[in-house]
């Protein structure tokens, strides 16, 4: 018998998950999905395909076997309070995708319910996400494998201990924004040199995809790949000297530490 999967919050990440599990790589029918969002219009497209839309968090819990909490961290206290009043909530499998919200926080608020914590990222929207997953001791093997299969439908999965979770936010979850910023910086630099046109950003994006694929599959370290591009006295050497002078690596390290610090602050609340 198919599990009913409920979503509380139907923003970009929830939409990406739903898109994955109902795609050709997934195994879930729209009829087995239950949705609630304060802004009900977010559910409309999924409802047209057969998903059930309900009017409260409690209704999601009552109608689902698996509950995906896809709300912002600041909305968690209200959502957990509503769910804690639902009879049988401790028997539901809870999946949380919020930054900084621990398994213990969710499970203890829901009378010991099994909880699996996931850090997805926005490239899930095109089936190329990276989802970092951990679980609680009360989540059994079947539950864990089910959740892993859900997220594999939208990309790759990394399994870690929860103690590493907040640090991984800076590595895979928030980090697409860093790459978007790098792409924007390259495009802005090109514009400053008088380059423009519809082909500029697609060319930069293809370059980033190609460079990342070469690094992943080429069997060389980042420094070794940099060396393959760099000729003594050449253009790349001059460009890299400026990046080092401007402390590019230090800026990234500082940004990642700030990201982790904020996740720790959210965990402490």
Segment roles from a protein language model:
Residues 205, 209-269:
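NAD(P)-dependent Rossmann-like dehydrogenase/reductase catalytic/cofactor-binding core
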Residues 29-32, 90-92, 198-199:
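Short acidic capping loops at alpha-helix termini that bridge into adjacent secondary structure
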Residues 33, 43, 60, 196-203, ...:
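Small-residue helix-packing motif on alpha-helices
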